[in-house]
């Protein structure tokens, strides 16, 4: 893991298209601004993990449904 220190209004550049800027530091909370192309999905990690979990449940449900339907046709 790369660890960098930044002050307010300083940025980190990721490739040519993504910039992460420190907007404010208030107590233990850091506010970040992220500029990235529209096709890049950006989520807080807990939201991203929730999306992955929901997608896995949906795939599992669809697989079970397909197996159930295919066994009924036989």
Curated annotation (Swiss-Prot):
GO BP, one annotated term: negative regulation of translational initiation
Plastid recorded as keyword: no
One Pfam annotation reads CsrA
What are the protein's UniProt keywords?
Bacterial flagellum biogenesis, Cytoplasm, Repressor, RNA-binding, Translation regulation
Task: Report the principal subcellular site.
Answer: cytoplasm
- Highest taxon above the source species: Bacteria
Gene3D superfamilies, from UniProt? Translational regulator CsrA
On whether Repressor is a keyword of this UniProt record, the answer is: yes
List where in the cell it is found: Cytoplasm
MF terms from GO for this chain are: mRNA 5'-UTR binding
Q: Where are the transmembrane segments?
A: none
Task: Return the GO cellular component terms, semicolon-separated.
Answer: cytosol
Function, as annotated: A translational regulator that binds mRNA to regulate translation initiation and/or mRNA stability. Usually binds in the 5'-UTR at or near the Shine-Dalgarno sequence preventing ribosome-binding, thus repressing translation. Its main target seems to be the major flagellin gene, while its function is anatagonized by FliW.
**NCBIfam families annotated for this entry?**
csrA, PRK01712.1
Protein family membership: Belongs to the CsrA/RsmA family.
Q: How does it assemble?
A: Homodimer; the beta-strands of each monomer intercalate to form a hydrophobic core, while the alpha-helices form wings that extend away from the core.
Instruction: Output this protein's name.
Output: Translational regulator CsrA
* Organismal lineage: Bacteria, Bacillati, Bacillota, Bacilli, Bacillales
């Amino acid at each position: 893991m790369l660890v960098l220190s930044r002050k307010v209004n300083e940025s980190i550049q990721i490739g040519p298209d993504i910039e992460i800027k420190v907007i404010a530091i208030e107590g233990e909370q850091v506010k970040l601004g992220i500029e990235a192309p529209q096709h890049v999905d950006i989520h807080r990690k807990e939201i991203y993990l929730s999306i992955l979990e929901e997608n896995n449940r949906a795939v599992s449900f669809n697989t079970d449904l397909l197996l159930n339907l295919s066994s009924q046709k036989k």
